[in-house]
Amino acid sequence: FKVKTRFSQEHELTVLGLGAIDDMKLNTETDPEDESKQYLLNYLPTIKQNTYTLGAVYKHYSGNHTQTVVLSRSFMNNSNIKYRDNDESSTDNLTLRLKSDEIENHLRFENRSLVGLFDLTAGFNVDYAVYRNNTFQRAFTDIPKEIRYKTDLGLFKWGIFVTSGYKSADDRFSASFGF
């Protein structure tokens, strides 16, 4: 969805979102004589996944200046599971159980000013991301072994930026600089 509202000449708000739900299952009714299909059936896990992204952009117009505030959040949840020979009757047959989440939150502010033939933009951003993973995997080699790991990671980042652009009156020359 996308909703854009102009409250007045100076104030504008846009809100948008996108989401998906995936529930993938194995087609166990395939031809048992088809080796390539049986290989895939025995190799691929069942996957459940859901994702969404939500965001909002507020703009304030003031003559040659525009202030913009952007706030967004993205989320992905993923779950994979696999049983040996697709036999779910016992946990002894479990070969893979993976659950993970990825979450990102973003905030950005910028001010854009048009001064003659120059375009000046400055601002800052603050982001926080989380990654979680809990995995169990049973590997069958010469000696069967179990692999287990768990991750819970949070990352904070921030930044500032400034850019300046110039475009000649006849549009034959342009230049920009920023950091």
Where are the model-predicted features located?
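Face-selective signature of the C-terminal outer-membrane beta-barrel domain
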Residues: 5-22, 45-179
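Acidic/polar loop-and-plug regions of large Gram-negative outer-membrane beta-barrel proteins
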Residues: 16-45
